[in-house]
Regions:
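Conserved ATP/PPi-binding loop(s) of AMP-dependent carboxylate-activating enzymes
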Residues: 117-121, 132-167, 206
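Gly/Ser/Thr-rich phosphate-binding loop
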Residues: 1, 28-33, 42-110, 123, ...
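AMP-binding/adenylate-forming catalytic core of the ANL superfamily
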Residues: 24, 31, 148-149, 173, ...
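Conserved beta-loop-beta connector loops within the AMP-binding
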Residues: 125-146, 185-186, 248-256
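Acidic-histidine catalytic/liganding microenvironments
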Residues: 44, 160, 217-219
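Short, P/G- and charge-enriched loop/turn segments at secondary-structure junctions
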Residues: 107-114, 166-168
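Active-site glycine-centered loops adjacent to acidic/histidine catalytic or metal-binding residues
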Residues: 66, 90, 116, 179, ...
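ATP-dependent adenylate-forming carboxylate-activation enzymes
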Residues: 3-22, 206-214
């Protein structure tokens, strides 16, 4: 097995076909990258004109991780590449995927916005602020029942105490991922945000990732981010920031109104 490392941007080096050139030249079978890279390509080349210049007949799968993969980007990549686009979730601490659609076992149905189900070796749970286990579709902190499977981090370098305090103390018997989300009725895991990205609006715990998912569905939006700001009445309010696709001519005021209405 050979790994090709590409150090550089997926656009502007010299164009939005940088990934396709590497895949074609080296007969790459699988690509692992962050959703941001594909959002950047989609913004610069929404119709895939650069993609059509290269032979990607050996390419078999795209794996997206490192941040939340919005459904619109996944669907765009599927349409363009005609191969499985797999949104999976793992952490530096775990060294390998916690949840994924495993191509080597049996491909499961894709649920856009979900990182699929826990892979063998992981028992993933959702815990609410009151320390109780969440019901299906209830938002909470994502944890993994101990012991962790082989290959995950056994401690922190010269910091055994900090390892225990940071990861194993807040939820007894569980590894705390510091990610937030929910598990649906079918066992699919939905990673919505980091725990510090949950905002409280008038007593309602809202996921910035869930709001970003809605904004990204607007046909003119290439990238978006949602943050919480202080509000005297409601505690916090969500503020959305959007970057438009290349070539959009619709005025900003109209797009803003449409985005607010969608949310």
């Amino acid at each position: 097995c050979t790994t090709v490392l590409f150090e550089g941007k997926p656009v502007g080096t010299p164009d939005a076909g940088a990934f396709w050139k590497i895949i074609s030249e080296y007969n790459v079978k699988s690509l692992f990258t962050a959703p941001t890279a594909f959002r950047a390509i989609k913004k610069e080349d929404p119709d895939g004109k650069f993609f059509s210049k290269y032979d990607l007949s050996k390419f078999e799968a795209l794996f997206l991780a490192g941040e939340r993969a919005d459904p619109d980007t996944i669907k765009w990549a599927e349409t363009l590449l005609k191969v499985p686009v797999i949104d999976h979730w793992w952490q530096t601490e775990t060294s390998w995927a916690i949840s994924s659609n495993c191509t080597g076992i049996e491909m499961m149905k894709t649920k856009y916005g979900s990182a699929c189900k826990a892979v063998p070796g992981y028992d993933v749970k959702i815990i609410k602020p009151d320390q109780s286990l969440a019901k299906p579709n209830e938002m909470g902190d994502i944890v993994v029942k101990l012991p962790l499977p082989p290959g995950t981090f056994p401690t922190l370098w010269n910091a055994d105490k900090r390892y225990e305090e940071n990861y194993m103390t807040n939820y007894k018997g569980y590894y705390q991922t510091y990610d937030a989300g929910h598990i649906d009725d079918d066992g699919y895991i939905w990673i919505m945000s980091r725990t510090d990205d949950i905002i409280n609006v008038a007593g309602h715990r809202l996921s910035t990732g869930a709001i970003e998912e809605v904004l990204s569905e607007h046909q003119s939006v290439a990238e978006c981010a949602v943050i919480g700001i202080k509000d005297q009445l409601k505690g916090q309010l969500p503020i959305g920031l959007i970057a438009l696709k290349a070539g959009v001519t619709k005025d900003n005021e109209t797009i803003t109104k449409e985005c607010v209405q969608m949310v």
